[in-house]
A protein has these predicted regions:
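Transmembrane helix boundary and interhelical loop/hinge segments in multi-pass membrane proteins
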Residues: 18, 97-116
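A structural motif at transmembrane helix-loop-helix junctions in multipass membrane proteins
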Residues: 19-26, 102, 163-212
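Selective transmembrane-helix segments that form parts of the transport pathway or gating/packing helices
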Residues: 92, 97, 124-153
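Aromatic- and glycine-rich beta-strand/loop motifs that create alpha-glucan
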Residues: 1-32, 265
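Hydrophobic alpha-helical transmembrane segments of multi-pass membrane transport/permease proteins
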Residues: 20-54, 85-98, 141, 211-222, ...
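Junction motif at the cytosolic side of a transmembrane helix
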Residues: 2, 104, 197, 244-266
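Membrane-interfacial helix-loop-helix connectors in multipass membrane proteins
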Residues: 50-71, 76, 149-177, 228-230
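Short helix-to-coil transition segments within interhelical loops
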Residues: 116-124
């Protein structure tokens, strides 16, 4: 069993250190806001531009257009566009934990601030749990919060009820509220793995950013018409992520053995 007072101590320690960094603050605050304002701005532009109200079927891959049914082409174009921008909300749970873990862990290596903590009765599991939560919690709060802001602001752009229904569909609800946290867990454990071997937080951050590639592949796959996100694909992805997360947690636990930290983190 975890001693949650110890876990809370670790979380407070991590936040006190990493939130002093401007790069971390930018990633947690400004980046999610930018990712939220971009799709809202595009929807507002489409809604206010009379010349674009008719829509163009050439803007939408045939495989995606088939999912629109009898919707007006302009609505289908908006749904397709929103579908692309919504993938930004799956980048946030990756980028935020990576930044927090990179600057937190590499900072501990350079300042040797972790060694005194290891002299306390805290267990390795509590240490990892606290470090993981300190990176995952801000990522999940930022992602969920910005998505809710997006949902509340979308009607102000003048979209139809059909477009609004798609945005609030089970596909994206599951993606944001299920896939998001799972990706955050993967990101923080991968960042722990990379940061434990890096001497510069920027290097650790850049290497860890490779996790963004699967999301980018989905984005380009949708643009090309090869992939159409649906509930089934989201659930399959969730199962795969659970397995990968478990493997990464085991790997992180192996890296954070006390003797490894004390002898190699010099």
């Amino acid at each position: 069993m975890y001693n949650f007072s110890r876990v809370r101590t670790i979380i407070d320690k991590e936040w006190a250190e990493v939130f002093k960094n401007r790069v971390v603050l930018f990633t947690i605050i400004l980046l999610p806001l930018i990712f939220t304002l971009l799709p809202l701005g595009m929807l507002g532009f489409f809604g206010s531009n009379a010349a674009m109200q008719g829509g163009d079927s050439a803007d939408v891959p045939a495989t995606f257009a088939m999912t629109c049914g009898n919707l007006p082409m302009m609505d289908c174009v908006k749904i397709f566009m929103v579908n692309e921008f919504m993938l930004l909300y799956l980048m946030m749970p990756i980028m935020i934990p990576i930044t927090i873990a990179a600057y937190g862990i590499v900072g501990e290596k350079t300042t040797h601030s972790l060694e005194p903590l290891l002299a306390t009765p805290i267990t390795t599991e509590e240490l990892l749990f606290g470090k993981g939560l300190s990176a995952v919690i801000p990522a999940v709060i930022a992602t969920w919060g910005c998505f809710l802001i997006f949902l509340l602001a979308v009607p102000l752009t003048g979209v139809s009820k059909e477009v609004m229904a798609y945005i609030a569909s089970p596909t994206w609800i599951l993606a944001i509220f299920l896939i998001g946290p799972l990706m955050a867990i993967l990101a923080v454990n991968f960042a722990i793995f990379v940061s434990s071997r890096a001497a510069d937080p920027r290097v650790a951050e850049q290497i860890s950013a490779v996790l963004v590639m699967p999301v980018m592949l989905v984005l380009f796959g949708q643009l090309a018409g090869f992939i159409v996100l649906n509930v089934q694909l989201i659930l399959i992805t969730a199962v795969v992520l659970v397995l990968v997360d478990f493997a990464m947690i085991r790997l992180a636990a192996h890296l954070f053995r006390r003797e490894t930290i004390l002898t190699r983190w010099k």
